[in-house]
């Protein structure tokens, strides 16, 4: 009893000390935070007052300027908040180019109305609507990038990419689907265009589209250009599908019959996979250009695709560009129709959450390559070589040691595709390609456990193929993915997925390659696909030997964490000046790597970083190494079955 009484006294004394300390802290000198301003009105699922008229003049192609006028219905005397789209679908991030909005001026009944930017949310503009005003005239410019360092170039003297999210201000407080827009665009004389929007009328260079919800408008960009062609990819099909091409020159639009057939086969193979479609019509927008910025961005009834100018005219040299269209087309099912519940938002200024991108992007990456092979856009060997490159890359990325695959779904928000000094350690949007390997693992496991009677094709049809013809988004949770997998083959799919999403094991998840009947190997000769990738990126990729990727003038644009070059202190931006005492060139460096395999001498490099020169000795003796997949005859050739066209 005495001991207890003593302990109680101590506890009471400690409590008194804590309370007195709390009082002292509460009374301490120093600044206190100001209260935050009232939050922007949350979106409600009710219709906006009336349609907003949106007029875009896209004729100033020399200066890359889009000129915008909106007429927005308002309630007289009531405050209004206008939002510039911030969280952009498909970007999975707050990437709206608010810095490119300029010249914002608002008028009511001909009189200037001042606006004030929100002190916390820079994408929001407060407007005091005058008494007696029933609408506001809102004028501004989208001063799009002139050069790549400013952002993606979307307008050139020969083509443009109009993304409506860049040229729209809209009222806060409403779901995007409840705001109606009446859009009009003025294009340069003689240009042609394509979009998923439906045309109401055309008067010379001025086109008026049928009214659309803000949701649909933002989901329906325009590609327009001086050199344009349109190809029917599904003549007589259930819903029109077209390939709409703009190019830097007219000769780049030449498409051979077999190339057209491969793109038509893409549509048919997608229908065989999913057993449905989720659009009234679909436009694959394709820009073949060195001047407008590249892109791959999904929409429900269209996709934006920008790739090398010689996509068709030098077909055999561009294998690594031919999975782009299948990837973006697949998103009509996976990403636009079936959408993660935490990624869907009611308007474009509510934050997205990206936790299920390993389905949205990872499985799309998987089906993109599979459909490319089944359609004949890629040969089986090219597809295997592409998979070898992916498997090797992730087998050498040691960042998994500290950062799980699940966390890379946050990368679009955290990094927003900014350059990384140590990508193999920091990790990037690995939910795409490591996600692809995870879904290959799942596909081959389903095949193995079902005696090769079921496959991930069955999951795709059951999960993405529902509600044929509907393009109202159908959201899902992690549990829904697990349930759908169990409907194909009963298994502990939750543990399977969480182990791969949350694990920190060394090396890439290569069980799918092994179960698919192949093994990852390295030889001294690169595949044609690997060489095509090097050529398009304008680099020499020595990742699997010296641990570097070398760009023009011997400058390193990637260094593998814990690789030979890393261990000698080389970094991105380092320039190789000399190899073994002779002036640098790529062939000389490759010869030195080969020679070092035959002797004990180190490879000596004179390097420059900034204004500092030094000599490093790379003690590397394993020769040139390039990834390939080699057939393992002890396992069924499931990968070959996966890549075979469906009848």
Language-model-derived ranges and their functions:
Residues 9-22:
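Bacterial N-terminal signal peptides
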Residues 368-369, 378-647:
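C-terminal recognition in membrane/secretory proteostasis and scaffolding
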Residues 51-57, 75, 85-87:
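N-terminal-proximal low-complexity accessory segments that begin disordered
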Residues 27-61:
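N-terminal, polar/Ser/Thr-rich
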Residues 46-49, 59, 65, 69-71, ...:
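Non-catalytic architectural context of zinc metalloproteases
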Residues 1-7:
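N-terminal secretory signal peptides that target proteins for export/translocation
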Residues 70, 232-357, 363, 367:
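Juxtacatalytic substrate-recognition/specificity segment
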Residues 67-69, 79-84:
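Ligand-binding face of N-terminal immunoglobulin V-set domains in extracellular IgSF glycoproteins
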């Amino acid at each position: 009893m005495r001991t207890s009484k003593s302990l109680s006294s101590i506890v009471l004394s400690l409590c008194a000390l804590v309370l007195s300390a709390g009082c002292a802290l509460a009374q301490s000198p120093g600044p206190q935070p100001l209260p935050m301003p009232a939050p922007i009105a949350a979106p409600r699922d009710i219709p906006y007052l009336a349609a907003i008229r949106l007029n875009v003049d896209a004729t100033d192609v020399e200066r890359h300027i889009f000129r915008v006028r909106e007429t927005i219905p308002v309630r007289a005397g009531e405050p209004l908040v206008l939002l510039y789209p911030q969280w952009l679908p498909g970007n999975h991030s707050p990437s709206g180019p608010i810095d490119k909005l300029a010249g914002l001026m608002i008028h009511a009944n001909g009189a200037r109305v001042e606006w004030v930017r929100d002190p916390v949310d820079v994408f929001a503009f407060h407007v005091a609507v005058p008494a007696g005003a029933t609408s506001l005239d809102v004028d501004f410019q989208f001063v799009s990038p002139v050069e790549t360092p400013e952002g993606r170039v979307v307008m050139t003297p020969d083509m443009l990419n109009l993304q409506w999210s860049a040229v729209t201000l809209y009222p806060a407080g409403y779901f995007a689907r409840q705001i109606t827009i009446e859009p009009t665009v003025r294009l340069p004389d003689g240009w042609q265009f394509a979009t998923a929007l439906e045309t109401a009328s055309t008067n010379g260079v001025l086109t008026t589209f049928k009214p659309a919800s803000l949701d649909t408008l933002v989901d329906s960009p325009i590609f327009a250009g001086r050199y344009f062609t349109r190809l029917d990819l599904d003549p007589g099909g259930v819903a029109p599908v077209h390939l709409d091409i703009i190019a830097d020159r007219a000769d780049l639009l030449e498409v051979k019959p077999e190339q057209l057939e491969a793109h038509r086969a893409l549509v048919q193979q997608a229908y065989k996979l999913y057993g449905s479609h989720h659009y009234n019509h679909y436009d694959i927008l394709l820009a073949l250009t060195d001047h407008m910025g590249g892109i791959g961005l999904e929409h429900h009834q269209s996709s934006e695709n920008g790739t090398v100018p010689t996509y068709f005219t030098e077909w055999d040299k561009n294998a690594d560009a031919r999975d782009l269209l299948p990837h973006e087309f697949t998103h009509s099912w996976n990403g636009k129709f079936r959408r993660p519940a935490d990624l869907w938002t009611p308007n474009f200024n509510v934050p997205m959450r990206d936790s299920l991108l390993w389905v949205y992007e990872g499985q799309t990456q998987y089906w993109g390559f599979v459909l490319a092979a089944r359609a004949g856009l890629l040969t089986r060997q090219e597809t295997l070589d592409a998979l070898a490159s992916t498997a090797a890359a992730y087998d050498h990325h040691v960042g998994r040691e500290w950062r799980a695959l699940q966390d890379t779904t946050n990368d679009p928000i955290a990094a927003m595709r900014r350059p990384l000094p140590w990508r193999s350690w920091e990790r990037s949007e690995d939910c795409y390609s490591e996600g692809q390997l995870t879904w290959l693992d799942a596909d081959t496991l389903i095949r193995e456990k079902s005696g090769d009677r079921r496959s991930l094709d069955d999951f795709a049809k059951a999960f993405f193929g529902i509600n044929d013809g509907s393009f109202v988004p159908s959201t899902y949770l992690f549990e829904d993915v697990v349930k759908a997998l169990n409907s194909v083959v009963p298994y502990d799919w939750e543990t399977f997925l969480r182990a791969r999403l949350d694990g920190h094991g060394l090396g890439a998840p290569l069980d799918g390659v092994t179960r698919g009947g192949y093994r990852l190997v390295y030889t001294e000769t690169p595949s044609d696909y690997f060489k095509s990738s090097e050529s398009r990126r304008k680099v020499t990729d020595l990742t699997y030997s010296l641990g570097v990727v070398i760009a023009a003038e011997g400058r390193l644009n990637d260094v593998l964490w814990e690789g030979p070059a890393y261990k000698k202190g080389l970094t991105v931006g380092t320039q190789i000046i000399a190899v073994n005492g002779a002036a640098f060139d790529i062939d000389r460096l490759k010869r030195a790597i080969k020679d070092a395999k035959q002797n004990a001498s180190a490879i000596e490099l004179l390097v420059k970083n900034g204004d500092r020169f030094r000599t490093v000795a790379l003690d590397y003796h394993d020769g040139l190494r390039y990834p390939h997949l080699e057939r393992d005859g002890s396992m069924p050739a499931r990968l070959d079955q996966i890549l075979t066209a469906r009848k």
